Each structure stands twice: as C-alpha cells, then as structure tokens.
Design a protein with these regions (language model features):
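N-terminal secretory targeting modules
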Residues: 2-9, 14, 21-116, 123-129, ...
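Conserved Rossmann-like nucleotide-binding pocket used by diverse enzymes
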Residues: 17, 154
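Structural cue for short, hydrophobic secondary-structure segments
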Residues: 117-118, 185
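Catalytic nucleophile serine of serine hydrolases
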Residues: 121-122, 157-159
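Short, solvent-exposed loop/turn segments at secondary-structure boundaries
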Residues: 126-131, 193-197
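Alpha-helical cap/lid subdomain in secreted, periplasmic
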Residues: 136-152, 161, 165-299, 358-360, ...
Length: 428
C-alpha cells in the first residue's frame, strides 16, 4: 500500500461463486473437425444466399413495422398519459407471460405478493427520491389497482453497481425476501469495458432469480444515458434467449425526443438518472405492460420460459458476499479495522487507515474461502485512496487502486480476481 500522509483502502466484501463461471468443455477428433469444415465449405454459397434472403425479409418486416408505428404517432406531453406509440416502442420483447399471469391471478385473488426490484442508482431512486422512484410508484400502483391484495415492496437498488455485484448480492438482498415478481435494471451500470463479464453476470443473475424457491416472474428494464449509451443490446440477447419480458425506457425516451415532444432535460437532471417525470414514465411503461397481460390473463397458459440451456457459455451463478457481519475465516492485522457503518449501500467493511511505512508493513487482510470464482468489492476515494496488492494462494493476481481523485464521488468498485475449473479452498 503506497501512499503517505493518510492512505485509505476499504474492502467492502469478497465476492465468491461456488458454481458457474466455467465454460462447458467439449472434445472432438481432428477428423471430425476437418469433416465439419469441409461440409461448411460445400454449403457456404447456399447458406449465404439463404441468409441474404432472410435478412432482406427481416428488413422489409422491420420497415413495415416502423411505418405502422409512425402512422399511429400521437404527440406526447409531460402532463399527459403515455401514448400508444410510446408503449409500443417500449416493448423490446413481450416475452413468455406464464409466470407473470400467475402473479396477476394471486393479486386478483387478494393474496399477499412480494414485489422486488434490483438495479443501480436509478432503481435506488437517485434524482427522484424513495417515494417517487419508478420502483415505489410501480409497487404503489399495484396496491391501488389490486386493492384487496397485500403488496410487500423490496427495493434492492444500490448506486454504482452492475450485474457482477448484483449476482453476488441478490440472494441476500432480494431473494431472502421471497419475491413473487422481480424487476431487473442494470443497463447503464453494465458497460462494454467488461462486456463478457457483465453478460455472464447478467445471465447468472436472471438464472439465479428464476430458479429461486418462490418461482418469481421476471420483468427486465432497459434504461439509457443521454447519448443513447446503454447495455440494452447485450442484455437483450440474454433476455430473448429465455424469452423474458424487456421494457425499454431507452427506446421510448430517445424516440420521443427525436419527435420533438420533449428534450432530455425534461426527464433528467444529469446525463443518466431520470428525474421525477422520468421515473413516472418508467413506471407507466411497466404498468401498461402488466395491464395488457391482465386483460388476457385467463388465456395465458402452457410452458414457462426455458432456462435449461444458459444464454452464455459460463454464467456466474450462486454468488455470495463475505462481509464483516458474516465472515467466519478472516484475519485482519495492523491498520486494518472492522467497521459496522454503511458505505455505498453495503453494511460493514474492513478499513485500512495508515500514515506510515510501519503501518503498511504490519498490515494484512486474509480470507480463506471455498469458491470457484473470486472477486472483491472495494471503495474508490476522491482523496487519500491508496493501492493494495492482492494474492490468491500466494500468487499476485492484481493491484487495487482506491484513488479516484477528481471523480464524481466515492463509490464501491468491483474487481474479478480469479476463476478456477472447480470449487476449492483458497487463501486471498
């Protein structure tokens, strides 16, 4: 750890995954591979022709759909209701509705239903507050619409966190509350800087939620930055693989701005977070989808979404966080202390706070874990952030840098440290 005067490093948690995060290895002989190549070569001309025809057909269909949407366009005003065009634009994937129909039937029967939300700062309510964020608005609408039912509301949004952190905290923060319906929003927190990791994390997150004991329905949400930056397309690949619903606030807002009905500042006070009117639109889009499913609920039956085959080759599943409150085999020495207060949405952390070389040389934080994949959460600081070398089984795997001088604020960062072929005991 290499900064004098006052050096700070906070280890929030160790992220471990016991299963998942390993590719499915297959083997084949050289002759089989050669045969496959030859067959592919012989049919390449026909395949190319078929693909070209299919692409042309898709393009024509897409153009016709666009014409239909434009023909039905109605101007939107912030103080009015959503237009049908906005609703249509939001339906990135209608999805399999069987589980959602089951939830709606419970609501209609006046039963108790737990509705959970997991995501980043947008879900948490930044720029709108706890009572006017899209999550609370949606839960309140459900309670008002199905007044005989009892709605339990769980908001597991934490700012500056993406799917990688999400898949490791979902069991404790959300699934432990036994949700019947879960909304997932991470499209501005997941970035292309870690595309594969984020895709595998999002895949694992959806799989973990889907396979949990209460068999919850899932509705995914796509949001956006002002310039259109979003992980929507990458998430959509996974969502469509499982045929889950995806509601795109991104598509709706950018299209409404393009038509000149609103400007970005109408729905956001910065370049990312919806403000109160923006959160209202997110919730209204979700309400519209649920209402449409309700109208047809008696006709919805059959098989649920099929999660047999993962969408990615190595989804990160069964993750958990080792924090001070739950740690059983952790040793902190020297200037590392254990603190119980909250930071960045997480309860408790290990804090290094040293001022001399002696503090540094006498300080260590050691975990013993049984895991297949290991990561770490640590705090980034706008001042006095230091560095720390991280070893796994006596091998240096990375150096963490907690310095975020000149940044927008302190936050929790994550680092994927190392993955193994199978779960086992490791020292970090």
């Amino acid at each position: 750890m290499k900064k004098r005067i006052l050096a700070v490093l906070i280890a929030t948690a160790l992220a471990v995954s016991v299963t998942g995060c390993a590719g499915n290895a297959t083997s084949s002989s050289d002759s089989t591979s050669a045969s496959s190549v030859a067959e592919s070569s012989d049919t390449s001309t026909q395949t190319s022709s078929d693909a070209s025809s299919e692409d042309e057909s898709k393009n024509e269909s897409s153009q016709e759909e666009s014409k239909d949407l434009e023909a039905n366009y109605t101007k939107y005003t912030l103080d009015g209701d959503l237009t049908q065009h906005m609703i249509d634009m939001s339906r990135l994937n209608e999805g399999n509705k069987v589980r959602l129909a089951n939830v709606i039937k419970k609501l209609k029967n006046g039963e108790e239903v737990t509705v959970g939300f997991i995501g980043g700062s947008i879900t948490q309510g930044t720029s709108a507050g706890n009572d006017l964020c899209y999550a609370k608005l949606t839960a309140d609408w459900l309670q008002k619409t199905y007044s005989n039912a009892k709605i339990n509301y769980v908001n597991a949004g934490i700012g500056a966190t993406g799917s990688y952190i999400g898949v490791h905290r979902v069991a404790n923060d959300l699934l432990s509350k036994n949700p019947d319906l879960v909304f997932v929003e991470f499209s501005v927190n997941d970035t292309t800087e870690n595309t594969e990791r984020n895709k595998k994390s999002y895949d694992g997150l959806l799989r973990t939620i889907w396979k949990s004991s209460t068999n919850p329905a899932i509705i995914t949400i796509a949001t956006t930055q002002e310039d259109g930056t979003s992980f929507q397309d990458q998430h959509a690949e996974i969502v469509k693989h499982y045929d889950l619903p995806m509601i795109s606030y991104r598509n709706t807002i950018l299209d409404t701005i393009k038509h000149g009905d609103i400007v970005w500042k109408d729905i956001s006070d910065d370049n990312i977070h919806p403000n109160v009117p923006g959160h209202k639109i997110v919730s209204q889009l979700l309400q519209a989808y649920i209402s449409d499913v309700d109208k047809d609920v008696d006709n919805i039956s059959g098989s649920e979404s099929d999660f047999t085959t993962p969408a990615t080759d190595a989804p990160i599943e069964n993750g958990s966080l080792i924090q001070p409150s739950s740690a059983t085999d952790v040793t902190a020495t020297g200037a590392f202390g254990n603190y119980e207060q909250q930071f960045g949405g997480f309860d408790g952390f290990w804090l290094f706070k040293g001022t001399s070389d002696a503090d540094i040389s006498a300080t260590s934080l050691t975990f013993k874990v049984n895991a297949k994949s290991i990561g770490i959460l640590y705090h980034k600081y706008t001042k006095a952030g230091c560095t720390a070398d991280v070893y796994i089984d006596d091998e240096l795997v990375t150096t963490l840098n907690a310095d975020f001088t000149g940044g927008w604020g302190n936050y929790v960062e994550c680092a994927e440290l190392k993955s193994f072929d199978s779960a086992g005991e490791h020292t970090v």
